[in-house]
């Protein structure tokens, strides 16, 4: 590790195979916490390269616990986190909204590392028991149209660095990696990123894959469509900037999207959205993220139709019923 750190301190970049080997060594416990923290710190001080990102991703996917749910052609809706905004669990709520609209979803998530509550925290608040058993995950897809994959069960390297990430409490390159390493390798993905350079990096990375994708970024720094500002959506060969008003939404204030101070607070907000008692801003931000996920699956549909499908799922109670069935089956 000493030689690797010297190389990085001298502003050199890692090759793809080199990055892959480093992540494998982290997962195998070959480096101590101080060495891993030093490595992470390097990537806080400069942008990660495409070769480095792909190498780290290669390692995680090679070491993953594989799960084959390809017959469902599922979508994952996931953000990098690390935007410092402490929003409620928008992407998780959007997942249940999309599932309620009839589209299969495989949500890959984790505990919050830089925020109060990650997707796994919300699931635990509902009594969900995590599993890596393919038959149980397949049954969840068949019965509820959604399955949840708790990242540490499927990616040993993510489990190994979890205490270090929590202690650092700032975004790291593992934030960038999380959305890229869903062990199912879903057919579709809606990915949220916290800055424009990462949007371009993700777009470039996904152009080499078979996954149909869209990458979103709100221009005021959110790693999802926040409706607080204009936002960019990038797909293979296309980028477009939208305003909330152009889609029929009022702009939100940042305070309206706050996730609270505890996992219990975040779970209450999540439940209010699912039950239809949340504020207009909270519901709208879930609807718009769900709509763009539906658009990834059905690119022929106008975005207005996708918004209508997402709204109907949330406001009719289909999303709530999907959550209820999911909790009953997986509790």
UniProtKB/Swiss-Prot annotation:
Signal peptide range: none
Function noted in UniProt: Catalyzes the transfer of the phosphoribosyl group of 5-phosphorylribose-1-pyrophosphate (PRPP) to anthranilate to yield N-(5'-phosphoribosyl)-anthranilate (PRA).
Name of the protein described by the UniProt record: Anthranilate phosphoribosyltransferase
Pathway: Amino-acid biosynthesis; L-tryptophan biosynthesis; L-tryptophan from chorismate: step 2/5
Family statement: Belongs to the anthranilate phosphoribosyltransferase family.
GO biological process, one term: L-tryptophan biosynthetic process
Gene this protein is translated from: trpD
Source species, domain of life: Bacteria
Residues holding anthranilate 2: 165
Species annotation: Bacteroides fragilis (strain YCH46)
Subunit organization: Homodimer.
Binding site for 5-phospho-alpha-D-ribose 1-diphosphate: 79, 82-83, 87, 89-92, 107-115, 119
Binding positions for Mg(2+) 1 per the UniProt entry: 91, 224
